[in-house]
């Protein structure tokens, strides 16, 4: 998925995702070795706990090594691996469409006030997922099962549109200003409909707790709006777009009305 590659969205200040592989571990060690080897002199009083002191001592000696805990974190996307919601959305869209990684875009065109189209923008193909089609097929089946009988089943029970997705609960270390422990980061990543996908929707809520109970509920509400779901039925007239399909054509823009001249 080229995780460290930006999605290329036409908005300023996009953040880069990070993959905590061996190269990252070595780079991180070079940048932080001096701090950990002089931890007692540089850490704040609140950071002088037995656990953090022991961690600093280990990081000073062999912080560039990939330990068993790092490998476990790497396998489930926790630890030092960091993804932006946009990047995860791009990844789920690629899984849904068969493996094509597309540049993400907001703008479709530049249009004058008189309706004249100055320039149109077409998304660019950034690459393809480097895996076998059978692996993508397995992933799609697994993501559907999450919503049918897994951790996403409860929130989408009786939903009339087939959703494929995955709950996520990112563990967080630390305390809030009031002294309470920080809650986990809630995630829900998805695409729909499962068989002929039109949308990829991802939600992340900082300190939101479990993925299904917080982000899953928010994603469900988004799909209700997109597809016009009322109760357990699809009501076409209630959809945000006709038949729940994203628009492909530019909207018609009427020429702007010329302002009246002030009377002399």
What residues fall within each predicted segment?
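A short, polar/proline- and glycine-enriched secondary-structure boundary/capping micro-motif
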Residues: 129-132, 211-215
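Short amphipathic alpha-helical face segments that pack within enzyme cores
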Residues: 84-90, 214-221
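Beta-lactam-recognizing serine transpeptidase/beta-lactamase-like catalytic domain environment
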Residues: 1-203, 254-264
């Amino acid at each position: 998925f080229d995780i460290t590659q930006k999605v290329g969205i036409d908005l300023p200040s996009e953040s880069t995702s990070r993959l905590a592989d061996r190269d990252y571990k070595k780079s991180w060690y070079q940048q932080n070795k001096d701090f950990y080897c002089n931890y007692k002199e540089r850490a704040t009083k609140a950071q002088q706990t037995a656990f953090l002191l022991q961690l600093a001592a280990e990081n000073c000696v062999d912080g560039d090594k990939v330990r068993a805990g790092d490998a476990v974190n790497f396998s489930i996307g926790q630890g030092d691996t960091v993804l932006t919601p946009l990047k995860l959305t791009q990844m789920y869209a690629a899984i849904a469409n068969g493996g094509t990684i597309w540049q993400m875009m907001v703008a479709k065109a530049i249009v004058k006030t008189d309706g004249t189209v100055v320039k149109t923008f077409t998304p660019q193909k950034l690459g393809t997922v480097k895996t076998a089609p059978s692996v993508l097929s397995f992933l799609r089946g697994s993501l559907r099962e999450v919503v049918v009988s897994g951790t996403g089943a409860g929130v989408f029970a009786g939903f009339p549109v087939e959703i494929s997705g995955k709950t996520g609960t990112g563990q967080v270390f630390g305390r809030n200003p009031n002294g309470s422990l920080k809650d986990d980061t809630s995630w829900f990543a998805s695409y729909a409909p499962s068989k002929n996908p039109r949308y990829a929707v991802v939600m992340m809520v900082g300190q939101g707790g479990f993925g299904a109970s917080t982000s899953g509920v928010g994603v469900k509400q988004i799909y209700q709006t997109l597809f016009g779901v009322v109760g357990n039925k699809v009501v076409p007239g209630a959809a945000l777009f006709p038949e729940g399909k994203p628009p492909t054509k530019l909207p018609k823009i009427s020429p702007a009305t010329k302002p009246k001249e002030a009377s002399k």
